[in-house]
């Protein structure tokens, strides 16, 4: 899969990338019905920028291995680059966490999952998007 943020961004700027965002937004709303409308902060780790609300209280966490970009393009920056297994948040501080383009590129998967669990609030929710390694998506 993608190892560089430039490749991921290029994909999301393509027609197939736009279709993917639309489809996954629909899937996310099945898991979180208020995905697009809530004021609850959403932390997106990996490369979640296409799925984050620019006007909301969302934060983007990108892996130092893949690289990072400023987000959003205007206004205060709400993106951070860190090691993929070290989320820069206090224990029990994240109510909703979206991992996308994170797990398939993780060098320390067990540690990543442990840290995700650490930062989630007791009633927090995590959504992990992982490509099927045998599916056609993994060959794009």
PLM region spans:
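A short acidic, Gly/Pro-enriched loop at the edge of an enzyme's catalytic core
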Residues: 85-97
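Class I SAM-dependent methyltransferase SAM/SAH-binding core
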Residues: 26, 30-87
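Class I SAM-dependent methyltransferase Rossmann-like catalytic core
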Residues: 1-34
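A short SAM/SAH-binding and catalytic strip from SAM-dependent methyltransferases
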Residues: 95-110
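Surface-exposed loop/turn positions
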Residues: 38-39, 93, 124
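A short glycine-rich, Lys/Arg-flanked "PGG" loop and its adjoining helix->strand segment in the class I
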Residues: 110-125
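Conserved class I S-adenosyl-L-methionine
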Residues: 125-140
């Amino acid at each position: 899969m993608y190892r560089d943020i430039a490749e991921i961004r290029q994909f999301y700027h393509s027609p197939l990338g736009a279709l993917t965002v639309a489809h996954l937004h629909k899937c996310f709303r099945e898991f979180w019905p208020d995905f697009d409308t809530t004021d609850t902060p959403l932390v997106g780790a990996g490369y979640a920028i296409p799925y984050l609300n620019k006007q909301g209280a969302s934060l983007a966490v990108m892996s130092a291995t893949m690289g990072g970009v400023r987000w959003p393009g205007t206004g205060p920056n709400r993106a951070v680059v860190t090691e993929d297994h070290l989320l820069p948040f206090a224990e029990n501080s994240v109510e909703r966490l979206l991992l996308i383009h994170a797990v398939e590129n993780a060098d320390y998967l067990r540690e990543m999952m442990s840290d995700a669990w650490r930062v989630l609030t007791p009633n927090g929710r995590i959504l992990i998007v992982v490509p099927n390694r045998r599916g056609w998506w993994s060959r794009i």
